Amino acid sequence: MSYPVTSQPQCANTCYQTQLSDWHTGLTDCCNDMPVCLCGTFAPLCLACRISDDFGECCCAPYLPGGLHSLRTGMRERYHIQGSVGHDWAALTFCLPCALCQMARELKIRE
């Protein structure tokens, strides 16, 4: 015997919300880690290459146009850090050494 279908299956809307966090250290907390601070001040491209390598990307990525911006945005996305592409752009454009030091410290803390 067959039974008629009286209701359609419903689609379950599962929504996952991830809790966004802040950077563990501030943009101007450069002196919290003196070796990183000195490297970011006097050899920022070397620090950028190290950050890229530690993050699992090609060490040449910082030399590509927009490479540092995508690296910082990728770091925010991977670690669920609050912010926006605009904030990333402003930090890297107006305060490159501080932004690089912040990224290096974040990787040290997270890894």
From Swiss-Prot:
Part of the insoluble cornified cell envelope (CE) of stratified squamous epithelia. InterPro entries: PLAC_motif_containing. Belongs to the cornifelin family. NCBIfam families: A_thal_Cys_rich. One of its GO terms (cellular component) is cytoplasm. It is found in: Cytoplasm. PANTHER family: DUF614 FAMILY PROTEIN-RELATED. Keywords: Cytoplasm, Keratinization. This is Cornifelin. The keyword Cytoplasm applies. Directly or indirectly cross-linked to CE proteins loricin and involucrin (IVL). The keyword Cytoplasm applies. GO terms for biological process: keratinization.
